[in-house]
């Protein structure tokens, strides 16, 4: 208690927060335990979602996993239950843009897990194309998957989250949802919408005790570039500098447990975000070199 008071006094004198000391390992503040939490995770069959699911089970959570690829979903569930046999894993296969699938996912949590504590909106789709080359189908698909489905699933989940234990919404945005990057204009616009929605919603649901975390990864070693909805230009963000899905997943777990509001889980992406805040003209010039 004396140590905490000492840090509080230091906070008053310097403006440093206790979280800054916690981030450096001096204090280990854990705001939320994930043990026995009932979690709905979308996009669970690959990439960050596939890496996140077993980590959540390891923390002691019960899961509803939603994804399009049924076989992959079953493989992930089998791996989880082999390692954590006491954890419940409910599978919902289908397209996140389908209203019936979203309803089925939320009801699976309510009926089979007894409620919902955490929603992780991880499902997404990508595209790399200049704005002028982006098709109408790409425009609509990027917002249907990355934004509209996320909002509508969150709306379905909120009444149950309000009754949950230490409730939380985790939204996956992107570094291109914080800074516009050439060839990611349409995809980035959808991710900007996710980041903005997360900030607004955080204020709106705080009175119910619901936290909102927005995650803004940089280039990550996933199938993103292999399954692009449209690809008419070379990716500006090089894949050889990507962080692993497992790293991003571990950072998400860390942020969830500590009640963070936003994380950028990659040094290069975090550097770009800071550079853009302090030297926006320079970043504008830099981006023209890739346009």
Annotate each language-model stretch with its function.
Residues 38, 45-46:
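Conserved glycine-rich cofactor-binding loop
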Residues 59-76:
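Conserved glycine-rich Rossmann-like NAD(P)H-binding loop of the short-chain dehydrogenase/reductase
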Residues 130-131, 135-140:
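Substrate-binding pocket helix/loop in short-chain dehydrogenase/reductase
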Residues 132, 179-185:
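Active-site loop immediately N-terminal to the catalytic Tyr-X3-Lys motif
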Residues 154, 190:
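Active-site helix of classical SDR
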Residues 174:
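Residue(s) in the substrate-gating loop at a strand-loop-helix junction
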Residues 207-267, 285:
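SDR active-site lid
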């Amino acid at each position: 208690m004396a140590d905490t008071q000492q840090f509080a006094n230091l906070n008053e004198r310097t403006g440093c927060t206790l979280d800054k000391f916690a981030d450096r390992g001096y204090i280990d503040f854990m705001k939320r335990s994930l043990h026995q939490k009932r979690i709905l995770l979308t996009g669970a069959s690959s990439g960050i979602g596939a890496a996140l699911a077993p980590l959540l089970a390891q923390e002691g959570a019960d899961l509803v996993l939603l994804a399009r690829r049924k076989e992959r979903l079953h493989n992930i569930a089998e791996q989880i239950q082999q390692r954590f046999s006491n954890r419940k894993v409910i599978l919902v296969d289908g397209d996140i843009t389908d209203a019936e699938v979203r309803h089925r996912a939320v009801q699976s949590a309510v009926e089979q897990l007894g409620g919902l504590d955490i929603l992780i909106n991880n499902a997404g789709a990508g595209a790399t194309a200049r704005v002028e080359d982006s098709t109408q189908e790409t425009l609509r698909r990027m917002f249907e998957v990355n934004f509209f489905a996320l909002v509508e699933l969150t709306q379905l989940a909120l009444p149950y989250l309000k009754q949950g234990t230490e409730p939380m919404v985790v939204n996956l945005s992107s570094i291109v949802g914080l800074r516009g990057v050439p060839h990611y204009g349409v995809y980035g616009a959808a991710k900007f919408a996710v980041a903005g929605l997360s900030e607004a919603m955080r204020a709106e649901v705080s009175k119910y005790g619901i936290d909102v975390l927005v995650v803004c990864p940089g280039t990550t070693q996933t199938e993103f570039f292999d399954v692009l909805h449209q690809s008419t230009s070379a990716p500006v963000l090089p894949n050889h500098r990507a962080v692993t899905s497992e790293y991003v997943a571990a950072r998400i777990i860390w942020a969830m447990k500590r009640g963070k509001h936003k994380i950028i889980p990659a040094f290069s992406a975090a550097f770009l975000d800071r550079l853009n805040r302090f030297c926006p003209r320079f970043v504008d010039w830099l981006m023209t070199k890739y346009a």
